[in-house]
Swiss-Prot record:
It comes from Alteracholeplasma palmae (strain ATCC 49389 / J233). Residues 39-111 form the KH type-2 domain. HAMAP family: Ribosomal_uS3_B (MF_01309_B). It comes from the Bacteria. Part of the 30S ribosomal subunit. Forms a tight complex with proteins S10 and S14. One of its GO terms (molecular function) is structural constituent of ribosome. Belongs to the universal ribosomal protein uS3 family. Keywords: Ribonucleoprotein, Ribosomal protein, RNA-binding, rRNA-binding. This is Small ribosomal subunit protein uS3.
Length: 248
């Protein structure tokens, strides 16, 4: 039976870039990877309710000591920054204590969280933990993503669905999600919902479009422009009058 690979890792170096961008001597690599892991673990824990979709880490050479540039993508920048930057400054202080290096902390707002796979998966997990129907949660998530400009969406929820004795998987799909096309910008994320019946696994695939030569992922993820409003439908009386007038 064929297994699906992670679409994010499959496209690294082709249309996607790495979330950790730095070079180091071979002996220093394990320590730096562990440092990146601790930074992400801390930020995801502190900003659990802030809708964090991605954390990018770059390492820069400074005059006195090395600097780490952390870019956090979030749907709720107000929660990350806090009043007068209080929450952000506290996070910077904690990270500098953790790494013993200077931290440059940037916050980027995610304009359309409805079509970002990581945020869709997090939102689905939150609803499932609040005892929402797994079918309804998936259908609403797909509709919102398509309305926001996604070309295709696929979801899968696994576990003791509805409290059933036997675990199973159930998913929904709408639009195109070409997993074998390497130029296809497919965003993929997973999440866990901790319910009274056990843990439910959530997988989300979102197709944004194809990255053609000379383009980048940013071109396929431009803000979606709403289409022109649909004409209003006439009521039955107006429609009958219109038909009679045409006949006469």
């Amino acid at each position: 039976m064929g297994q699906k690979t992670n679409p994010n890792g499959l496209r690294l170096g082709i249309i996607r870039s790495w979330e950790s961008k730095w070079y180091a001597n071979e002996k220093d690599v394990p320590a730096l990877i562990n440092e990146d892991y601790n930074i992400r673990k801390y930020l995801n824990k502190v900003y659990k309710k802030a809708g964090v979709s991605q954390i990018e880490i770059e390492r820069l050479k400074g005059k006195a000591k090395d600097r780490i540039k952390v870019t956090l993508y979030t749907a709720k920048p107000g929660i990350v920054i806090g009043r007068d930057g209080e929450t952000r400054n506290k996070a910077v202080s904690e990270l500098e204590y953790l790494t013993k290096k200077e931290i440059v902390f940037n916050v980027v707002e995610v304009k359309r969280p409805e079509k970002v796979a990581e945020l869709v998966a997090q939102n689905m997990a939150e609803q499932l933990e609040n005892r929402a129907s797994f079918r309804r949660v998936q259908k609403i998530a797909i509709q919102r993503a398509l309305k926001s400009g996604a070309k295709g969406v696929k979801t899968l929820v696994s576990g003791r669905l509805g409290g059933a004795e036997m675990a199973r998987s159930e998913g929904y799909s709408e639009g195109r999600v070409p997993l074998h096309t390497l130029r296809a910008d497919v965003d993929y994320a997973t999440a866990e919902a901790h319910t009274t019946y056990g843990v439910l696994g959530i997988k989300v695939w979102v197709f944004h479009g194809e990255v053609l030569p000379g383009q980048t992922i940013l071109d396929t993820r431009k803000p979606f422009e709403a289409s022109a409003p649909r004409p209003q439908r006439r009521n039955r009386k107006e429609a009958n009058n219109y038909v009679n007038a045409k006949k006469n």
